[in-house]
Amino acid sequence: MELWLTGTILKPKGLKGELKVQPVTDFPDRFLSRTKYFAGRQPETVVPVNVKSATLSQGFAWLFFEGVDSREKAQEMAGMHLYIEEKECAPRPQNRAWLHELEGMRVKGRDGVEVGVLTAILPMPAHEVYEVRTGNGTVLIPAIDEFIDEISLEGGYIVVPRFDEFL
């Protein structure tokens, strides 16, 4: 079973187990209709969770799960990721990439010279940030058109011509 990341649990809200979730999807409305997720800190350690109720507000999903009925139980889930099965995903729109397809891609700087590997995609309120591992450590690159010139799924690379500005 292949799992796809769809959200990150940020923190509990209130005393009854409600959870604030940062969607990591182009389709946040699907949080309103989905009844099951797989929750875990890594895809290898997930457990199924059933949704009791869901709302969307201010760019976040607010979820109640069966069996999570207190702030303490909700706090244990903070920092976990929510995954769905690949078969539940909508087809990828043309000229778009799923986030998990980008992880592991080579990152090229000016003149096509390889500078590192994309190791993680960090969800942030304004936009995602790419974590790139280089020979000298880790660099964070905002995932916006100003810095990302090209993403080639077929070639397995991302072009960041101004990479030197982040060193």
Curated annotation (Swiss-Prot):
Gene Ontology terms: biological process: ribosomal small subunit biogenesis; rRNA processing
Residue span(s) of domain PRC barrel: 94-166
Places the protein is found: Cytoplasm
Keywords attached to this entry: Chaperone, Cytoplasm, Ribosome biogenesis, rRNA processing
This protein's record includes keyword NAD: no
Keyword rRNA processing on entry: yes
Pfam families in the record: PRC_RimM (PF24986), RimM (PF01782)
Gene Ontology MF terms in the entry: ribosome binding
GO cellular component assignments: cytoplasm; ribosome
Organism domain of life: Bacteria
Family, similarity comment: Belongs to the RimM family.
Main function: An accessory protein needed during the final step in the assembly of 30S ribosomal subunit, possibly for assembly of the head region. Essential for efficient processing of 16S rRNA. May be needed both before and after RbfA during the maturation of 16S rRNA. It has affinity for free ribosomal 30S subunits but not for 70S ribosomes.
Subunit relationships: Binds ribosomal protein uS19.
UniProt remark on domains: The PRC barrel domain binds ribosomal protein uS19.
Descriptive protein name: Ribosome maturation factor RimM
Species, as recorded: Chlorobium phaeovibrioides (strain DSM 265 / 1930) (Prosthecochloris vibrioformis (strain DSM 265))
